[in-house]
Amino acid sequence: MYEKIVIVLLLSGYISTQDVTEIIPHEISSKLPTQAGFISTEDPSFNTPSTRQDPSGTMYQHLPDGGQKARQQLVHIFSEPVIIGIIYAVMLGIIITILSIAFCIGQLTKKSSLPAQVASPEDVDPEVL
């Protein structure tokens, strides 16, 4: 039973992180308001300029008017190895949390193995025999 609960929780997390436009069909989403904070029905591939990488390693964006400009890289306060370490630490934390919850559920559902008490012949009620 707990396996089903864990599967449902994992699937609910996956579903809640999906893009809204994947969940809502285009016909329904076109009827919804498109103001700020609401669902956009436009295809993002039309608005996003395409990118290509030069052999030198520089990324270029193709602008809608046909021009190109060099893509600016974000400046991070952490270096690449530190970011990788942070990602691995978060993954490890999630895995440890899941395993500890599974262990706790296993401990709570495990039947206690108390030794069965055997009645000695002196303790038996003579009227029962």
UniProtKB/Swiss-Prot annotation:
This is Glycophorin-A. Belongs to the glycophorin-A family. Component of the ankyrin-1 complex, a multiprotein complex involved in the stability and shape of the erythrocyte membrane. Glycophorin A is the major intrinsic membrane protein of the erythrocyte. The N-terminal glycosylated segment, which lies outside the erythrocyte membrane, has MN blood group receptors. Appears to be important for the function of SLC4A1 and is required for high activity of SLC4A1. May be involved in translocation of SLC4A1 to the plasma membrane. The modification Pyrrolidone carboxylic acid is found at residue 18. GO terms for cellular component: ankyrin-1 complex; plasma membrane. It comes from the Eukaryota. The chain crosses the membrane at residues 83-103. It is found in: Membrane. Residues 104-129 are cytoplasmic. Residues 1-17 form the signal peptide. It is a single-pass type I membrane protein. Homodimer. Component of the ankyrin-1 complex in the erythrocyte, composed of ANK1, RHCE, RHAG, SLC4A1, EPB42, GYPA, GYPB and AQP1. Interacts with SLC4A1; a GYPA monomer is bound at each end of the SLC4A1 dimer forming a heterotetramer. It comes from Canis lupus familiaris. Its main location: membrane. Glycans are attached at residues 29-30, 34, 40-41, 48, 56. It holds the Pfam family Glycophorin_A. Keywords: Glycoprotein, Membrane, Pyrrolidone carboxylic acid, Sialic acid, Signal, Transmembrane, Transmembrane helix. Coiled coil: none annotated. Residues 18-82 are extracellular. InterPro entries: Glycophorin, GYPA_B.
